Structures are given as structure tokens and as C-alpha cells.
Amino acid sequence: MLHTTLSSSIVMAKPRVIYWFRTDLRLHDSPALKAALDLKPEVLYPVWCWDSHYVYRARVGVNRWQFLIDCMNDVSQSITKINKKSQLFVLREPAVTLLPKLFKAWGITHLVFEKDTDAYAKERDAKVMQSAKEAGVEVIVKSGRTLWDSDEVVKANGGKPTMSITQLQNAGAKVGDIEPAVETPKSLPDPGELKLDFDQTQPDAKPDFNEKYRDNDEASYKEGLSGPKNDFHPPTLEELGFKPATTPHKGGESVILKSLDKIIGDEEYTGTFEKPKTSPAAFEPQSTCLTSPYLHFGALSCRYFYHKVEEVVEKRRKAKKSVSDPPASLTGQLLFRDMYFAAQAALGWSFAQTYNNPNCRFIPWHLPSKVDLSTKLITGDYEVDDEEKEKQLQRWAEGRTGFPWIDAIMRQLRQEGWVHHLARHSVACFLTRGGCYISWERGAEVFEELLIDHETACNSGNWQWLACTAFYAQFYRCYSPIAFGKKWDDNGDYIRKYVPELKDLPKKYIFEPHKAPIQDQKKAGVVVQGDGSQAKEGELMTYPKPMLDFNEAREVCIQGMKTGYHVGLYGNSPKVLDGTWKQLFDDAAEGPTEGKQGGPGGLMTFEDADGADEADQHQPDSPQKGKSGAAGSPSKPTRGRKREHSQGTLDFSKSAKK
């Protein structure tokens, strides 16, 4: 009787839950949010911790900030539509110092969030989980950012990074089927009292990697935890010290779901999509789905997207209609994303650099990164080993190389925050192995600042791919800054849009304006001269002369790549780690400009890339220990590999004696 009386008088306290939003700014298909709601909590606090790492230590330009703020406001409005008492509560303090204080102030029993395998996020989350353990708070973490849990993929791949689509697919098959999407919640619990009876911890604002891009002082932490209006809204661009954004792309779950309905509704487009066949020169509208920034911020679930596309593909297959297959298809693009995420999950911080990266070939690029030997991590600074290369980097980043195709891409990127996948290929190849011979890490940093869809895994992976230091090895296939653009846009409409000083040039000269007679230049209202730093010459607009001879530069780069492949070092090779690699290379890292002939494996030609390389991935040789203890020299790349049905062909190949 006593036992019964005691049992009936005990009322189990209901969970009090913080749902920590991060890169999952959506309500649809959120496994972590479902786990939080399955607790049947008494209160649910949807929280965003304003993280100083991204404010100061990551390169984030104004367009990506605006896109993030759009996504935050959108999901907050969606939360409020379901529960008028709730919203996304943005608290202006990093999670590591803030959450332990919230656990106590709000009487929290559970912390729930979506897993993030980025190197920084892993370290941050480990600290938060330790604090939760000490506070007696249960932590629930669910995978939802990728098709498969990246950590599980790594385990299934033998603890190694996935370096090809095939490896990813094989490992994914071992992990299991891609989970179906979970339903969007129809109700949300009330938040509890928002007591903030503790001091705000001010983060260290130095170093500020974004200081040079700000027009005013950064002030997002100066008005307390709940912001200047005490409304828990996201900081504004003005508070971050930026001018208004210039991107036409608006973020938000509601925005992309409407767009996705249109994409999926066009069954032929969805079912037959092949990335290498889409035009990098298309604009208003672009030729692809432009889902990448929404995937990055989690406004769109990759699993939801994947299954929606698969439904269309299966429907077409049953109807005996044509369909595209990975890796060129829409689902193939999601597989590439998972491949890069799993590669990063395996390697951590070193994935985003050459130094100490066991899967990244070492090439003695110009403008190499400085390294903190105590951590084996790059510092964010680099060595200017050649003043001319420093000028080339700045001209490339600002879109004034004198190659209109390259400049149009870089200007679109800076203005809008997004460019087509093959446009990224063009400018990345040009900066690295196909023109300037500048470290891919410099290009990755510029993209980190400018892209609205920047993800460390995909950005670093793509740059290594295009630099032929990992994932892809056919370095003799280069993107011509002239021929490749002409293939897609012979009239130069894309150039006329983004390089308006050339808009009135005749078609004959639009890709090579320096070849136009001076009278044709003046008639078009432009004069080709200088380096592009001077906008006008009298009444005429100016456009720079080419900053290099592409044909000569390409040959020099290919010779340098050939030497680098022959030496066979990787980022973790002892000679790279101790600096003695210099003994193995000529003073001119990219090799002599003449006197040596022949490409890789005796190849006597180079080729213009056609953009089909992702549908044509040849698995690069894995680094292996040689007798010297360094990574051994891999077998040399060869031509003549059998092309599979899904692979592209060289639409624009040409050969030239070296």
C-alpha cells in the first residue's frame, strides 16, 4: 500500500529541451528535431548561438551573411506560424560559453542537435557535450546533413577518406539504405521563460579575417545576448559592419521548397539532368537547380531532395523513358557532396590543406601557405615568394586578368555569390595548374569569402580536384580561358553581362579584346591597356591586357605538374614536413619554360578540358610508403582508359606539340 501511494504521488518531470539549430535551418526532414519532439518535452527552446568563429575566424563575405540571415528569419517565421509563442531565439554568444549557462538558467534536461562533421564543429561540439555531461544534461545527436552519416561512411571505408564516388557508394551500401525523409512537425511546444540572469561572455575579436571587407566596426556582440531590440533576432549586416548584399539569391526553407516543386515538376529536366551538359554561361535563369546554398545552411534536406529525384527517375524508368545516372545526374551531385564530407570527416583539419594531408599531392606552388609547426595547421597567411604571382592572384580575385571569360566568372561570383560548377572549374584550373601555378589554397580562400554555398568539405575537395592534387589526376587536361568559353557562349553574352565595358565589342574580339584594332576598341567605348586598376581613360572605359601568355603558361604548368607527379610527395611525406622537399625541385618550382618535351608518361600533347571530368573520374593512385619512407611515386597517368557509358567525351580537345 505504501509503495502504491508513493508511486501515484510521484510525477515524472517532463523534459526541458534546447534544440540547437546550426546547419539545419529547416523544419522538413529534420531527424534531430524529430528526436527532440519525440521526448514530448514540457518546453522546447529553438536556439541559435551566434558563433564568433564564423564572425571573425572564417572568411565570410556579405552575400553569404545575407543568405544565412534570410534562412534564419525564414525558419523563425515558420516556427512562429506553428506556435505563436515561439521563434528562433538568436543569442549572441558562442555555444561553448553560452550553453552551460543556459542549462542552469532554464533548467534544461536535454540538448538536441544535428551532427556536423566539419573539423571546427567537431571540436566545438565535443566541448559542449562535455559541459552538458558535467551539468547532467542528456545530449542527443542525429545525422541529417548528409545522405549517410559521414562518420559511419568512414568506418565502412576502413577508416580512410572516400576519394571517389565508387568508394562512397560501396561504403554507403555497407552503412545501409538512405533513410526516408521524416515529416514536418505540425505542432511545437512552447518555449519556457527566457531568463538571462547571467553576464554575456564577450568573444575575442582578434584576429578578424573579415576586417578588411567591413566598412564599419563589427558590433554584433555589443548590445547584449538578445540584441539591441531585445527580440532575439539575428544581427543585421549593418551590425556586422557590412554594406548591403548584392546577391539576387534569397535564402530560406520556404523559398527553396517552392523552387524544388518546380524542378521536380519538370520530370524530363529532373530525370535526364547531366551536369557536364549544363551551360556555365547561362544566366537569368541559370542552367542548374541552384540548390547548393540551401543544402549548405540546411534549408533543404539532402535526403528529401534525393528521394524526390529518385521518385521521378523510377517513374521514368517504369515508363521506359530515358534517365541519367550518377555521377552526372542530380543524385550524383549529392553523392559527390557526401564523398567530400566523408573525406573531411576522416582527415579533420588537414583535409583543407596540403601540409600533413596524406591524400593531397605536394606540388611546390607559388604563394604557399605559412604553417604553424606546433599544430601542423596552416595559419591563414602565406608567403609571397614572387611579387608577380601576388599581382596575378589579386587580378584573378578581382576579375581583371585580361581574359574576359575568367573575369566574367570572378565578377559574377563577387557580385552574386554563386557561379556554375563548370565556371568554377575554369577559374580554378586557370589559377593553379592551367595558368598561374598559384597554390589552390589561395583560390579556396577567395571562394570561402565569396561563395554563398561555401562548405569547407566541398570547397577544399573541389580545389584539390581542379588542381589535380587529389581526386583527379589528368593534369594535362586544361580549361582554355578562350576556347572553353566559346564552346558555351560563342556570342559572348555572358561576358557582355558581367564585363560591361566589353558589351559593345564585336563577337570576333569578345573573348580576346586585346586583338581588336584600336579603332574597333574606341568604337566600342573601351581601350585595352594596363592592369585594370584604372577604370577609365578619358571618356573611354578600360579593360586590361592579358596578364600572361596562356599557351606558354600552360606548358610551364604542365611541366611543373609532371615533375611534381614524378617526385611523388604527399602532404604528410617526411620531406614535406621537414622542408627538405626543396632539394628535389628546380629553383623555378614549375620547371623550365623550354627544353623539356613530353607530358605524363611520355605524352606529347595537352588537351583542352571539356568539363566532363566529374563524369570521367579516374581513381588517383593512393599514396603509398616507398623505400625512402616518403609517399612513393604513383604510376603515371595514361590516356586510352576505356570510357564508360556515362562518361563525357572531349568536345573541344586539341593537341599541340610542346
Located regions from the model:
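Active-site-adjacent structural elements in folded domains
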Residues: 274-279, 287-289, 376-379, 387-399, ...
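Long, charge-rich low-complexity segments
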Residues: 401, 466-511
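Glycine/tryptophan-enriched, flexible segments
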Residues: 159-379, 489, 493, 497-629, ...
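Contiguous, well-ordered alpha-helical segments that form the cores/surfaces of helical PPI scaffolds
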Residues: 289-292, 304, 329, 338, ...
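Glycine-rich phosphate/pyrophosphate-binding loops
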Residues: 37-52, 306, 419, 423-424, ...
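Trp/Phe/Arg-rich N-terminal binding region typifying the photolyase-homology
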Residues: 2-197, 411, 458, 551, ...
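An acidic- and aromatic-residue-enriched active-site/binding cleft used to recognize and process polar
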Residues: 22-24, 49-51, 93, 116-118, ...
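Active/binding-pocket-proximal capping segment
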Residues: 351, 357-362, 423-472
